[in-house]
Amino acid sequence: MIPQLNRNYAWAIALGLVARSSLVSAGPCDIYASGGTPCVAAHGTTRALHDSYTGPLYQVKRGSDGATTDIAPRHAGGVANATHQDTFCAGTTCLITIIYDQSGHGNHLSQAPPGHFIGPDSQGYDNLASAIGAPVTLNGQKAYGVFISPGTGYRNNAAKNTATGDEAEGLYAVLDGTHYNNGCCFDYGNAEVSGDDTGNGHMEAIYFGDLTAYGTGSGSGPWIMADLENGLFSGFNAKNNAEDPSLSYRFISAAVKGGPNKWAIRGGNAASGPLSTFYNGSRPNARGYNPMSKEGAIILGIGGHNSKLTVGSSISLRATTLCCTTRYVAHNGSTVNTQVVSSSSSAALKQQASWRVRTGLANSECFSFESVDTPNSFLMHNNFVLLLKSNDGTKALHEAATFCPQLGLNGKGNSIRSWSYPTRYFRHYDNVLYAASNGGVHKFDNPASFNDDVSWVVSASFA
């Protein structure tokens, strides 16, 4: 385990474990407790995280009749009773509805509600995970981990006894080393209680993936990093830590610890061997992270403000440039611009400023944005001017109407990059929308305030 940092809160999660000859003689939370830092949250669907734990690990809900049942370990400290789940779910589907906290603090995880970003399920909630998505074998016994697909997430915004402000804490997780992507963000840890982005340093969570928009490690990833809100960090340098290696183990142990102006990343093979230290030092060299402003909610599978564009959802896009934070991307006929929109605006304007997220017309890894009030018409660029145009089915339009979001270049929200012209982003310039580059021959390519002008806060749509 990681060396202790003053007063500490320990969190543990074990959602997928590799087959091993036997369980270790002490559970992860027993080990933390022996070091004077008992778990305040302990989530695991494959096994008990305390040797003495006999309570429920998780709850599943049956698709055929909506009935639920709890899955417990076979014996104190043991592997989950997958046989009970298989019997209960026979002939139908099951979802994981609750992941219980084994620490005794009641910090259970349930379906994440809508936050800064809305989810794909009803009323904007995130999806629940399939109960059979991540089968594993532990100590010769079948168990099920939690398979997190994009749009799946769990959360507790009222967690008890978790670290807040600049208090110290430790986070530990066992993860599937083959299941990751470059989206933002697969996290487990401490996040905002509101589900909104409340600023740098307001969360501290384990991240695993190969997103390169902010921090990176050596090689091409995936890496263990820390999501501290508005940035993924691998060390002191906000851009790169060459000591944070790309990992290729089938199952990975990941740990992040943080205290006042000190934090650490550790990781290793979950099947055997010790953890290695990838970083141990001062907080990142960026504003807002020293001191930290942690809020104490718990998340799994999502970013602190529920970040992940979801196909089928409806969104509005707000400018983040200081001059223009009440202005949203809207259209007037085929012209795309920014307009001041609020809850008191007309119904017509609210619709003009609302967009449905669709699978990218040219690339399914990215997105296209369909007008709410003009169905089958999409945002696209023509001579780098953004327009609203009806989908004529042509390859040219599909490419011009496909965009790839990434973390906002100014640290806020998202920047939306053209798939067909990867150096160009959604930008407002004189209140008109362009596909602009950071410097170039066009007036709208002016590098002044570029990062602010291409960063957008994504929220639930006005209509």
Swiss-Prot record:
Pathway annotation from the record: Glycan metabolism; L-arabinan degradation
Glycosylation sites noted in the Swiss-Prot or TrEMBL record: 81, 280, 332
pH dependence: Optimum pH is 4.7.
Region: ABD, residue numbers: 309-463
Disulphide-bonded residues: 29-39, 89-94, 184-185, 366-404
Positions of substrate binding: 227, 230, 304, 381, 383-384, 428, 430, 433, 453
SUPFAM superfamilies the record matches: AbfB domain (SSF110221), Concanavalin A-like lectins/glucanases (SSF49899)
Top-rank lineage group of the source organism: Eukaryota
Record's keyword terms, sorted: Carbohydrate metabolism, Disulfide bond, Glycoprotein, Glycosidase, Hydrolase, Polysaccharide degradation, Secreted, Signal, Xylan degradation
Annotated region described as Catalytic, given as residue ranges: 27-308
Group of enzyme by EC: hydrolase
Site positions (Cis-peptide bond): 184-185
Record CDD domains: beta-trefoil_ABD_ABFB
Any Pfam family the entry gives: AbfB
One of the protein's GO biological processes: xylan catabolic process
Temperature dependence as stated in the record: Optimum temperature is 70 degrees Celsius. 50 perscent maximal activity is exhibited at 75 degrees Celsius. Reaction time was 10 min.
Function recorded in the entry: Secreted alpha-L-arabinofuranosidase that actively hydrolyzes p-NP-alpha-L-arabinofuranoside and is specific for furanose configuration of the carbohydrate ring. Also exhibits significant activity against polymeric arabinose-containing substrates such as arabinan and arabinoxylan, a major component of plant hemicellulose.
Family to which the UniProt record says this protein belongs: Belongs to the glycosyl hydrolase 54 family.
Domain comment, as recorded: Organized into two domains: an N-terminal catalytic domain and a C-terminal arabinose-binding domain (ABD).
Protein name, UniProt field: Alpha-L-arabinofuranosidase B
Lineage, uppermost ranks: Eukaryota, Fungi, Dikarya, Ascomycota, Pezizomycotina
